[in-house]
Amino acid sequence: MDLNNRLTEDEALEQAYDIFLELAADNLDPADILLFNLQFEERGGAELFDPAEDWAEHVDFDLNPDFFAEVVIGLAENEGDEITDIFARVLICREKDHKLCHILWKE
């Protein structure tokens, strides 16, 4: 993989959020979608992290944080707080030539 051909943090966040919006209706409960849409302006967010260790239970490849990122999308208690009501965790490949993502949805 090429370190010089990676998505920036902002590009990774934007791409993960776009994928979330495209697939949310098929994967979230309608009540959760309504709550997210009503509250996102005030309490919503997307945060970028290195991939959590539990992704190893869901994927069968090395999760090098140079090339993979986890984006947590959801709602916080208050604006600026950490996201506590998680609607999706998106694992995304940051290399521009490898379009790969996995999503763990709120159950």
Curated annotation (Swiss-Prot):
It comes from the Bacteria. Signal peptide: none annotated. Pfam families: DUF440. Transmembrane segments: none annotated. InterPro entries: dsDNA_mimic_put, Put_dsDNA_mimic_sf. NCBIfam families: PRK05094.1 (NF003469). Belongs to the putative dsDNA mimic protein family. May act as a double-stranded DNA (dsDNA) mimic. Probably regulates the activity of a dsDNA-binding protein. This is Putative double-stranded DNA mimic protein PC1_1990.
